[in-house]
Amino acid sequence: MRVLPLISASLLAVAGCGGLGDRPGDAPNALATMGFGLPDEHATARVEVFRRGHPDIDLRVNEGAFDEQQFLSAVAAGDPPDVVYAERSKLGSYAARGAVQPLDDCLDRHDVDLGQFREAPLSQVTHDDRVYGVPEFSTLRVMIINNPVVREAGLDPAALATTDWSALPALVDRLTRFDGGKLQRIGFDPKVPEFLPLWAKANGADLAGPDARLDDPRVVEAVRVTTELVDRQGGWASFKAFRDTFDQFGANNHYATGQLAAMPMDSWYLNTLATNSPDVDVTVVPFTDRRGNPLTDSSGSAWAIPKGSRHPGTACDFIATMTAPDTWVTAAKARRDALAAAGKPYGGTFTANRVADERIHREVFDPGDNRVLGQGVPTVLALQENAFAVPPSPAASELLRAWEGAVNRVLNGQQDPRESMAQAQREAERALKRVGGR
């Protein structure tokens, strides 16, 4: 396997700031993590399973968000953490740079059946046909439709779809509300730039991969269609300003107040609605491509072992334990029980492992009379098997910045879609050239 350059000048400059490992004098039984936190029972229960099975290990969970530059600097300095928890969309980049180790021997030692993992999450942790990480949660994107608002416009919520792009402008006009020229209701939020991979895929294009180009006419069309939908709703400045007023995580959210008719959204938001607005009247359906086929992308994090990890064997034990179906079921039960004690609903647990999900949704999940979860959770579970993922790239972070920046320029009226995506492609090519890949 050809390893791409790991250490840039900027990383060398900060490498002396200190690493993230256990320190040379630490006991051999220490295990230091990076990028992982303990926010709820999904984390704490699984960590407890590992601690019980490995009482001799001094597990040090360094809570906090993953910092890419800090991680690469620590690897360059020869002082990395033992195990890292990072966005799996970027793991291919770290593998290409030689910053993480292949897990073939680790997975074989623990008899981990990769066939249990769904294709999309697994593809993101695979580089040159070798697996460099084990994926964890799997968040999807679904359409959440505000039934009263849509019915008020004389439409059937169940029939609302993203299949016919030529019909979307008229749909937006019908659902959007202005008062004295001021936006009062968003008819349809296309969620760009962040959901551009979904719109591009719906048009038959990927944003990364050997044959992908950001200036592909199909990508340009996706940018044009979605940004024009925003323009029809007052333009980006007023659209975003109005959206920023939403009580997204409260009882007076945009579905409860009628400030939004429909949008694609991350599946985790169903839990928010189920908790804060359990009686809100919504329909949850798949996003569809231009042929009418259900379409969604899977995102989440993965565990990996950095190059230079002092305790790769223990790190392997930790990863295998944290991602085992039995451990997931234990965590799901703990999460369900903690939420029940607080008077809150449990919206299921969705992982990259189909065996774990099947058990959780058979043994643990029960929507009760919560309407949001009753219809939303089965939709998400059914979509998991057919999700796609943005292909891994040696320059994943740079590509993300390139296409998001391009869409933002169009939204702000600085460039037209063709010109902006052409610039994004040039930026992507420079980034790929810097890391020596495609």
Language-model features: locations:
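Hinge/lid segment of periplasmic solute-binding proteins
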Residues: 88-141, 283-285
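Short helices/loops that flank or line small-molecule/ion binding pockets
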Residues: 69-80, 97, 149-150, 169-178, ...
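C-terminal lobe and pocket-closing loops
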Residues: 269-279, 292-297, 305-401
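Short amphipathic alpha-helical coupling segments at ligand-binding clamshell hinges
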Residues: 42-46, 221-222, 310-322, 420
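Short helix-initiation/N-cap motifs at beta->coil->alpha
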Residues: 63-71, 89, 162-169, 239-253
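Glycine-centered hinge/linker elements that transmit conformational signals in sensory
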Residues: 172, 211-244
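Conserved C-terminal helix/tail region of periplasmic/extracytoplasmic solute-binding proteins
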Residues: 374-438
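Conserved N-terminal structural module of periplasmic/extracytoplasmic solute-binding proteins
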Residues: 2-93, 110, 245, 326-330, ...
